[in-house]
């Protein structure tokens, strides 16, 4: 493969590129600009993209990785004890803790305890307000996965277990709607959620741009700003021009002047880098305030125009990774930097929140020690983030003509990884759980068929059962894997062009 024809480096080209980049690896996070200019309409169509892609009117995907296994029967498909013939031995709840929502198939769990496993913090959560507020734009699809390994299950929740040549949902969205975006696919996830797909035919711009620290990352999006005593821009431009001229005349430059890797590197360094700097992303994406301890103005920097609002919505943005990721995700979409962003908790403890712990060890996987408390705490964390993002996106106009908000063109996919085992010691209210293939996923968007559960739950086993992805018809007893259906459902709801993909018809996901 060559970079020119596929947007991908061959092994030999990669080795050459690495040697070229050795002195400038700090540029990598923001030098992966769009490669679509190298693609012909025919090659784009072969990649599964329409020739008349909606370049001027993008749609957006937010993936939230619920690391550790977010149990759907501890949230929207919870089972009451009175409904099950095996209530004492399974993960069923006292009837009063499972609240119904008028004219909705969803349920909401209310939970209270004085501690979270062995962690001495109270857990008091109630999902009812969230469900009431968002039910009309919520869809829950039951699922059976194919792995209970964290990393593998996380990645398969993004690829549908290789449903479309191994590409991830984020990559498919970047290909479809990311043309012209500086960084179409930004990934702040962890583990398998952060992995790229295996479709090597995609342009490089479709693959995720990793971001480790969302609060500090924007400060690296300019080669000279923020450096005390840095030369003015015209001097830097002159130095860069001189450097490029010398490189071109060097023995190395003349020897490898026809190398596609060197041509690409020169384009990144000489064309894409100045373009990215001209976008002023170092300001637009910067949530940090100008304080004595963070003297932005001293170094010629300033906070984003949206900074104060985001710091109010996400007060823990600097110490709580999820809040910081959510703040950056909103800005990446608002300023049309990206069409796909990925975020979510990792397995590390985060200090903060009203009780001192923002993220418990192992995130949802703390359910090994305290299933009910862990699920309640982490679902509250996820749903709070989702609610804040939706509120921000609803208030943000998409454009001046259509009357649409950003939310009208956005889909949030909560990738739950896998489920949890259902048995418990007879009548126990505190117990641990293991990993289980059986679960469900949550989608939220004006584009999905809202107020809908695809599939259902058998109350006597508390296992979910499947559905027909085309018609939405429930199929009790169906417990076979349906990962491609979920993958196709997300893209179908968004209106992606799936011609040539071989994906199943998932019309049941889409609002009509």
What spans do the regions from the language model cover?
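Ligand-binding pockets and gating/stacking loops
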Residues: 2-512
């Amino acid at each position: 493969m060559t970079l020119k024809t596929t947007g991908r480096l061959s092994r030999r080209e990669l080795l050459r590129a690495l040697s070229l980049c050795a002195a400038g690896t700090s540029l990598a996070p923001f030098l992966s600009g769009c490669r679509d200019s190298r693609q012909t309409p025919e090659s784009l169509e072969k990649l599964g993209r329409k020739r008349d892609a909606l370049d001027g009117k993008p749609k957006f995907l937010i993936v939230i990785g619920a690391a550790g296994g977010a149990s759907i029967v501890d949230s929207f498909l919870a089972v009451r004890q009175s409904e099950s013939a095996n209530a004492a031995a399974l993960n069923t709840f006292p009837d009063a803790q499972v609240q119904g929502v008028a004219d909705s198939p969803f349920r909401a769990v209310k939970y209270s305890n004085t501690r979270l496993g062995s962690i001495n913090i109270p857990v008091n959560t109630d999902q009812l307000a969230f469900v009431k507020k968002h039910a009309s734009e919520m869809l829950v699809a039951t699922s059976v996965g194919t792995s209970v390994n964290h990393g593998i299950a996380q990645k398969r929740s993004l690829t549908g277990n290789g449903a479309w040549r191994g590409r991830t949902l984020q990559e498919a969205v970047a290909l479809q709607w990311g043309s012209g975006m500086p960084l179409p696919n930004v990934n702040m996830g962890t583990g398998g959620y952060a992995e790229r797909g295996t479709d090597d035919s995609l342009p490089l711009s479709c693959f995720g741009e990793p971001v480790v620290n969302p609060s500090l990352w924007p400060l690296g999006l300019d080669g000279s700003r923020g450096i005390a005593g840095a030369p003015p821009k015209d001097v830097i431009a002159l130095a860069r021009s001189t450097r490029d001229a010398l490189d071109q005349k060097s023995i190395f430059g003349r020897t490898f002047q026809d190398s596609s890797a060197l041509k690409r590197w020169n384009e990144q360094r000489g064309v894409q880098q100045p373009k990215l700097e001209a976008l002023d992303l170092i300001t637009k994406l910067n949530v940090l305030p100008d304080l004595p301890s963070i003297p932005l103005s001293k170094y010629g920097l300033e906070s984003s125009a949206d900074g104060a609002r985001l710091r109010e919505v996400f007060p823990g943005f600097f110490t709580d990774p999820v809040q910081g990721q959510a703040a950056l995700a909103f800005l990446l979409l608002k300023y049309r930097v990206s069409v796909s962003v990925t975020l979510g908790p990792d397995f590390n403890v985060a200090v903060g929140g009203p009780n001192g712990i923002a993220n418990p060890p192992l995130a949802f996987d703390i359910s090994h020690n305290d299933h009910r408390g862990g699920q309640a705490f982490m679902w509250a964390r996820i749903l709070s983030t989702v609610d804040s993002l939706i509120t921000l996106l609803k208030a943000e106009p998409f454009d001046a003509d259509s009357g649409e908000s950003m939310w009208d063109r956005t889909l949030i996919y909560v990738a739950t990884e896998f489920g949890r085992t259902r048995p418990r010691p007879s009548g126990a209210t505190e117990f641990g759980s293991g990993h289980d293939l059986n679960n469900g996923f949550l989608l939220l968007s004006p584009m999905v068929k809202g107020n809908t559960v695809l599939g259902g739950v058998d109350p006597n086993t508390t296992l979910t059962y499947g559905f027909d992805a085309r018609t939405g018809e429930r199929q009790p007893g169906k417990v076979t894997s349906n990962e491609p259906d979920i993958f196709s459902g997300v893209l179908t709801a968004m209106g992606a062009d799936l011609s040539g993909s071989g994906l199943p018809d998932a019309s049941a996901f889409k609002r009509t």
